[in-house]
């Protein structure tokens, strides 16, 4: 187990549907700590860089267009194994394959409107955080609930 950070984004459909609060609650209730958050309308170039690994896919242009369609709630969460556990909280990329109780299992139907993005590895989390946030935007703080969430520091 390691203490790490992950990048989580609530996509335009999630923002438009008023899901920012419920999604934040899922991460807070699990015991993770929010260290950065902003509502942004990123430029196309930033989205193309974020999804560069998908640039050869037929759905790439549609994905970028969809991500440009409204504001995105960009966040950085911190905690033990937050990358892997965060992906579990989000559910499978295809909402129809997501278990009930996951964000996508509860709030999404179509893969093209799957509400949120989460880093898939610690390495990618670092890249995504650097793409979306300046270092000074990440706030270092100790949650009052830390000792109630973690047995050992």
UniProtKB/Swiss-Prot annotation:
Pfam families: NDK. The active site is at residue 117. It comes from Aspergillus fumigatus (strain ATCC MYA-4609 / CBS 101355 / FGSC A1100 / Af293) (Neosartorya fumigata). This is Nucleoside diphosphate kinase. Homotrimer. Belongs to the NDK family. The gene is ndk1. The keyword Glycoprotein does not apply. GO terms for molecular function: ATP binding; metal ion binding; nucleoside diphosphate kinase activity. GO terms for biological process: CTP biosynthetic process; GTP biosynthetic process; UTP biosynthetic process. Major role in the synthesis of nucleoside triphosphates other than ATP. The ATP gamma phosphate is transferred to the NDP beta phosphate via a ping-pong mechanism, using a phosphorylated active-site intermediate. ATP binds at residues 11, 59, 87, 93, 104, 114. It catalyses: a 2'-deoxyribonucleoside 5'-diphosphate + ATP = a 2'-deoxyribonucleoside 5'-triphosphate + ADP; a ribonucleoside 5'-diphosphate + ATP = a ribonucleoside 5'-triphosphate + ADP. Its EC number is 2.7.4.6.
